[in-house]
Structure formats: structure tokens, C-alpha cells
Amino acid sequence: MPLPQMSYGRAVSWLAEREPERLAIVHADRSCSRAELDRRSNRLARAYAARGAAAGDLVTIGLPNGIEFLQACAAVWKLGATPQPISSRLPEKERSAIVELADPALVVGVEPGAYGGRPSVPQGFEPEAEHGDAPLPDVTAQHARAMTSGGSTGRPKLIVDLVPGTCDPEAAGNGMQLGGTTLAPGPLYHAGPFITAWQCVLSGGTAVLMSRFDAEGALALIERHRVDWALFVPTMMLRIWRLPEETRARFDISTLNRVMCTGAPCPAWLKRAWIDWLGPEKIWEAYGGSERIAGTIISGTDWLAHPGSVGRPTGDRKLRILDEAGKECPLGQVGEVYMMPPGGQGSTYRYLGAEATATSDGWETLGDLGWLDEDGFLYLADRKTDMVVVGGANVYPAEVEAALEAHPAVRSCAVIGLPDNDLGQRLHAIVETAEALSDDALREHLREHLVVYKIPRSFERVSEPLRDDAGKLRRSALREARMKSTGPRPT
């Protein structure tokens, strides 16, 4: 019989009462048991409360990946407050803009005084001795989390979850095993890794974290901790796949039952490679936003029957494809993806710093373009703002990037549109490679995958990865930087 829903804070304590020594979190050479997580979060909660944090508040958490990050989140929930994670490496200007927008009661991860009179505690903070670890009154956070926008727009935006922080600690979700071990190698300030790590911990499992993703290191952690569930973005899957075959073969990853790919559409060739390697029953993909309006999921088995798809809507969530006039697109025609949660518009989130894009009858869009097949499977094209119109033809950068990354020497890439006096826009590819590759070699490779008008007119080499740790591209920032330096292409 399922347990009644309990608050996240109570779930941490309930699990600690049953198996106190069982590991809840592993990071690098450190670990944290259920009992340690419970006691530490009780002390932190009291220290945070002494600095003004209370039920209903937002608390900004700007800590790097690690045990301290999750302990801080648990402490915030035990106060009935809402964690609002941000990157610990954000430039000061960007971080200040987010803090101003969130107006948190407390900032965790910065030195006191960093934001004037706003209370804050630094990384490595130790609660004062008077703050004990005895149990706290049970309080439910009315908002489970407040995630910062992924950054693709370049403007700070908070997505406040309207669902309260409650769970059943005897129910695992997303195909996880109850009490299993999950690898969450991405940055915890992004929704996917954050939700994944906590789904695991709050259902009695062990979350294995990484400071920064490393392909060989990820395989070593899967073997060492007998990981059965892992969350990867396509960039991580690409880096693992690009390891020498003999390197991949050194690691025993037979305990891995599910790989969930999310964050960006996985290139078809890469998805097929992983299916061939581990089997279709283990390779899954999910699509959705932090807004949780709707989402899709697809197994490897279904993907083989619908290659390139990101799946069908989950639960009672709905989606439709609309053209620019707001009319429903025929099957197979690209349009904007609109979604509706079971509770209707406004039932899952609210924005701080932005407005939802919605139809008059409440269907919302995150700005993605895609199409549906006759079985209701969704296929993504790209983001609407990233589409490039070349001589009147629509080109989706993600398609060109997937073709470029199919070259074994291409580590990462980004394709953007730049002004062109003849075609209106031209395609420009920014490429990080493992070895020297001429423009002609790249064009020859692309001719095997794309029609001529989708092949970039110009190429640029860079030595640093173009995607962040969560696999996100800021195409708008890349485009803006090149516009300043190049301007329109002369005729």
C-alpha cells in the first residue's frame, strides 16, 4: 500500500530513521549517509532560519556540485522554503541580476556582505554550535524549486514550480529502481540533474555526483558504484562514444539498466550507436522544460520504429503543432510546439522575469519547432529563434550540427545565421575539432548528410567547448559576438 505523500524534509528524516547508515550521496572521494544528510540539514536549517530564511521564501544556492549542495537544499525544504539554484561560476553581473530578480531571503555560497545587507553564507559554511541536529517541525515547501532559465535566451528568468515539495519515499519515478544508484553528472543548477538526483535520494537511493563531466570518469563511476540509472545530455553521450573502443570496453557497466538522454535532441546516428552498444531497452530520451507544462518520453525500442522522435506526451499532458497563424499543422509539417498540462494553463509554474507565450485558450509554447507523425510521436526541428532563413528556405541549425558532429574529429560545434546581402542570411559553423580539418573536408563530409543549401558558407575554428556543462548552446550570444566583428557579408 503506498505511503501518504510527505514533505521532502520529512522524507529525508523518514529514510534516515529506517536505514541510517545507507549512503544517500557520493561525490569524489566523499560520501554522505542518510543519517548524516538528516542531521546536517537540521543544523543548516536552524542556521538559515537565524539569518531570516522562513517558510515561503526563496533561498538562492550558488554552490558547486557536491554533497554540500544537496545538504543545503534539504535544509531549505525543512524550513518550508524553496531552493533556487544558480551556477557557482556565474559572472558577478549575471549572478547579481538573478539575485535581484529572485529577492531571496538568503544566498548560500557567497561571502557575507556580497549583496549589501542581504544575508548570505559562504561555501564551506559551518553552523554555529548552538544550532543542534534534533528533528525539526514538519513543514511543506509550497514551491518545490525555482530553477534559473537554461540561458539560451541570454536573459535571466526564474521558473517557480507551483507543485509543493512532497513525495512518496517508497515510489521511484522515471524507471528508477527503488533504492537504486543513479549517476547525475550534470550541473545541479539545471533542472534535469537536480530533479534526477533528488528523485533518487528521496526514494531511498544513492545519487552519484560529478564536479564536472568526464567521459572516462563517468564510466569508472558506473562500474565502481554499480550505477543502474544515468542521466546524460547528448554532448556527454558523444564524448563517451568518442572514447577509443578499447577504453570503453575496460569498464563493466552491466549494472546500467537505463540511460536517460535529455537537454537537447540526440542526433539519430548517436542514438543508434548507443542502442547498438547497450541495447534498445536501456536507451531512453525525454523532452520537456523546467516549466513542466508537458513532456514526452521514448524508449529505444519505440525509437527504432520512429527514428528521430522524442516520443509521445506523458500522462494526461497534451501537445499540438500550430503554424504562424495559430492553425493546427497537418501531420509531418513543422510548426511551433504548444503544450497543455492536466490542470490547465498556470497550474505547474510561474515566471519571474518573463511572460508565458500562450494562445487565447491557454496552450503554451517554449519556442520549440517540431512536427507529429501519424502515431502521435513528436519530432523536434529546433528553437524558433534559432531557425535560419537562407534564400527563403528554412534551415534548422540543430540538423546541421548533428551532421557535423557525425564526423569523428568534431568534438563540438554551433551553427548560426549571419546577415548576407544576397541570401538574407548565411550559415556560419563554429567548430571545435580534435585534429586539423580543412573547410573543404568538412563540406565534403556534410554533402553526405545534407542538401547543398544547408551546408555552411563559412567555418570558424575554436579550441574551447561551445556547450556548457548541461549541454546548452547560447547561439544568440555567439551570433551577437560575430555580428560585432564581421557585419554583413559583402556582395
Ranges and model annotations:
Residues 21-52, 60-66, 91, 95-96:
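Conserved AMP-binding/adenylate-forming core of the ANL superfamily
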Residues 167-181, 189-229, 243:
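Conserved AMP-binding/adenylation subdomain of ANL enzymes
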